[in-house]
Amino acid sequence: MKTRATSPKDNAEDQLAGCIEKFTPEMAKAIRAVRAALRKRLPAANELVYDNYNFFVIGYSSTLRPSNCFAQLVADAHGIRLAFYYGSRLPDPAGILLGSGKQNRFIRLASARDLSKPEVEALIRAAVAQGKVPLPATGRGTLVIRSISAKQRPRRVTAKPARRR
């Protein structure tokens, strides 16, 4: 039996697919659509993947350093968000950013189409512009699996058990 040599990129894509498959089929489809839209919008950005206890995250960065991520696709069993690590510094005239911490802000995404709204595009442009390291004008970013936690919250909403009386 022949085995096919896999490149690190193939392996990373396979691992990413495995992370996304933990979600319901509808949520997985939405995650893939948002990722494709962000990849089209930010082709030179590196994708840093974290499948942690609470959230599945793909950070978009001009380098391979997590601290240089300017935007993140964040998903859990309840929905998808676009987060900005330095979101408190972003101009938000439409008032769509949520969150009250010192730095992080996010928006909820109903679908990938939300990324094409002018106010969301403006936030992405501003986040890229305020990045510590400029995003390359050309080229294709790398997919890097940074962390997959062994213990995770369920990625699918489960029905609550009936209360005993």
Where are these regions (language model features)?
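Charge-dense, helix-prone N-terminal extensions
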Residues: 1-165
